[in-house]
């Protein structure tokens, strides 16, 4: 899976996501761009 390194900011790509209150490598939950 693709994702951002821990601590990196989301740049809006589908491979970005927010988990556990921090930008980490993981899959984006549904509506992440609205709820995040």
From Swiss-Prot:
Keyword presence, Signal: no
Subcellular location: Secreted
Expression tissues: Expressed by the venom gland.
GO molecular function: calcium channel regulator activity; toxin activity
Secreted found in the keyword field: yes
Pfam families: Toxin_34
GO cellular component: extracellular region; host cell presynaptic membrane
Cystine connections: none
Keywords for the protein's UniProt record, in alphabetical order: Calcium channel impairing toxin, Ion channel impairing toxin, Neurotoxin, Presynaptic neurotoxin, Secreted, Toxin, Voltage-gated calcium channel impairing toxin
Protein family per UniProt: Belongs to the neurotoxin 04 (omega-agtx) family. 01 (type I omega-agtx) subfamily.
Main function: Omega-agatoxin are antagonist of voltage-gated calcium channels. They block insect neuromuscular transmission presynaptically. This toxin is a blocker of L-type calcium channels (Cav/CACNA1).
Protein's recorded name: Omega-agatoxin-Aa1b
Provenance organism: Agelenopsis aperta (North American funnel-web spider)
């Amino acid at each position: 899976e693709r994702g951002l390194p821990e601590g990196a900011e989301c740049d809006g790509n589908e491979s970005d996501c927010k988990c556990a209150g921090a930008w980490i490598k993981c899959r984006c939950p549904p509506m992440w761009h609205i709820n995040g």
